[in-house]
Amino acid sequence: MKRKVKLKPKAKRAGIIFLAVIVVLSGFLIYRVWSHNATLAQGLDYIQEQENKKVKELSSSLKDKKNAEMESAIESGQVDVFALFDDAVIFGDSRAMGFSVYHFFPESHVLASSGATIKDISNWVNQAQSMNPSLIFFSYGVNDMGLGLDSEGGYDALYQSQIEQVVKVCPDATIVVNSIISATPAAIEKSPRWDKVDEYNKKIKAMCEKNDWIYVDNSEICQNGNADIYQADGVHFLQPFYTTWAENMIMTVRKQ
């Protein structure tokens, strides 16, 4: 018969210690590999994030450069600003009518009438649909303030509901809404309701932000009613201003 070999206590302990060391070392090595992979993944994510950031910054920088070049070309007369509105229409009142009256826009591209308010937008929806422009501008306000339309449940809500009728038939168009251009101080003195420009514009801007529409701030080009751009009535504009206004609109769109 073969005799069973009995390990001495010291040999057993040594074997157990050896196995324990192997387990610990294996665990350590596994942890190191996992930790290395995790660190590597984090590093790669960081590198990718920085690369994406650089691409965005470069894209933004190139866009800014192109816009600066375009602005310079427009100001120098190398580019006709009104040619950039070939596929655009503008809804509005008598102020907007100036674009066709002074022959800057074709009459069919100016969906406006004297004394119009935002409530008249619906009158032009069918024409907008038939033209299907890529850019749709809106410019109202003087008559709206005169009639106190903000008292009818909120000017911004009313304006939005009107624009949505246009969006429904021209879903691919970019929507651009002008701030109300202030009348002169003398004109406001005669008609105090026109003094609510800031109040109305705040609502127009909030409406645009809510709906992802483009808001055009015209306060600088009219100098809050003090610029030399007005006809004798202090409300309507002289012919040269329409070029300035068009530049402000199109450059605002390009900078988005």
What kind of feature is each model-predicted range?
Residues 1-85:
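N-terminal secretory targeting modules
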Residues 37, 183-256:
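Catalytic His-Asp segment of secreted/periplasmic serine-dependent ester chemistry enzymes
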Residues 75-158:
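Conserved SGNH/GDSL esterase-like catalytic core that processes O-acyl groups on lipids
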Residues 111-115, 144-153, 166, 189-194, ...:
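Second-shell loop/turn segments in exported
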Residues 139, 178-179:
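Alpha/beta-hydrolase-fold catalytic nucleophile elbow
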Residues 152-162, 194-200:
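Charged helix-capping and loop-helix junction motifs
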Residues 170-174:
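A short helix->loop->beta-strand "cap" motif at the edges of active sites that frequently abuts
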